[in-house]
Swiss-Prot record:
Protein name as it appears in the record: Phosphoglucosamine mutase
Cofactor: Mg(2+)
InterPro entries the UniProt entry points to: A-D-PHexomutase_a/b/a-I, A-D-PHexomutase_a/b/a-I/II/III, A-D-PHexomutase_a/b/a-II, A-D-PHexomutase_a/b/a-III, A-D-PHexomutase_C, A-D-PHexomutase_C_sf, A-D-PHexomutase_CS, Alpha-D-phosphohexomutase_SF
Domain of life: Bacteria
Keyword terms: Isomerase, Magnesium, Metal-binding, Phosphoprotein
The keyword Nuclease belongs to this UniProt entry's keyword annotation: no
Organism: Shigella boydii serotype 4 (strain Sb227)
Residues the record lists as Phosphoserine modifications: 102
HAMAP family recorded: GlmM_B
Amino acid sequence: MSNRKYFGTDGIRGRVGDAPITPDFVLKLGWAAGKVLARHGSRKIIISKDTRISGYMLESALEAGLAAAGLSALFTGPMPTPAVAYLTRTFRAEAGIVISASHNPFYDNGIKFFSIDGTKLPDAVEEAIEAEMEKEISCVDSAELGKASRIVDAAGRYIEFCKATFPNELSLSELKIVVDCANGATYHIAPNVLRELGANVIAIGCEPNGVNINAEVGATDVRALQARVLAEKADLGIAFDGDGDRVIMVDHEGNKVDGDQIMYIIAREGLRQGQLRGGAVGTLMSNMGLELALKQLGIPFARAKVGDRYVLEKMQEKGWRIGAENSGHVILLDKTTTGDGIVAGLQVLAAMARNHMSLHDLCSGMKMFPQILVNVRYTAGSGDPLEHESVKAVTAEVEAALGNRGRVLLRKSGTEPLIRVMVEGEDEAQVTEFAHRIADAVKAV
């Protein structure tokens, strides 16, 4: 069991100006990380950020702490999170640090680390960093202080990496694509990747100003993308979140295509090409339609806990190469070491180009089940509503009514006193009624 005080499942995150996302904390974090990572040999760390205004302040604090510990910082400027995983590997840096709060609003920020191999930092190393933070900062001798420099071709390197995951024999020259970069870290990457592969690109959400990241654009709000795809009569739309590790797509009719559908397309294409190894990993929230569609293809499917960290763990446990969350995290271990929105999107585009099929048609083999989610607030400290007999009884009744053609999932939020009630089945009216019946039982406790 982990005793970590600051690190969560995806690094350290919070509201800027409130602990722990403060300049003094981040400076000490940089120093503590430097002390731990310096023990492993290399003395250079890559530092990247998304487009939040607070990134300037936090990268300076990190760099000062690292320098005091004797490590040098290599700045990339705004870059997608998966780009840092790639650059950390290619530069043989001891670690990569990303300053980002992903899909959160601009006033939040966070810090996460990648190991030298481009994977998330092991728990043991995060715990060692936290232990170091309990000590007083001490500076190395002046001659051993770290330096700071910039990787001037970071964007170009990553663009070429992304393009290399798209088959040489294919082209996007017949596609008109609207790309929404969420005013985030992909704003200068994704449009160029698609254009260099031949696509006719219309870019939105590519004017970051420090405070508009994820604001009514991007993977968490595709309404602007849907409207633009229809207005431009485009073949499809592609949306990324603020740090580029999520992708959501929109077909030519304006229908949203989520991470479950994206994984279905990629897994089916891998099967057709004889490249699929093993099965596919989803989460407890993955649509039942995905599980049934993969079963029809003979592709094994497993569910992990919600969170890309747990998806990756399950993939590694089973030796499988494809995993995804319906929120748009898609992990393709044959291509990269972490979730990469651009790379995942390119694999869908390759399937479209190779089969001369629209995104809409590629999704047609998978029927999405209606999935109703109701959040119920409860009084903290009043006991666990999920253990109450009345809630268990109603849940059992609903599960019996759904049989093997539906699911019930009750989850407690990890950050606030909420119970998330999810009911999934073939009939939307029925699952809506069932979800509210369970929610009412939770409220009555």
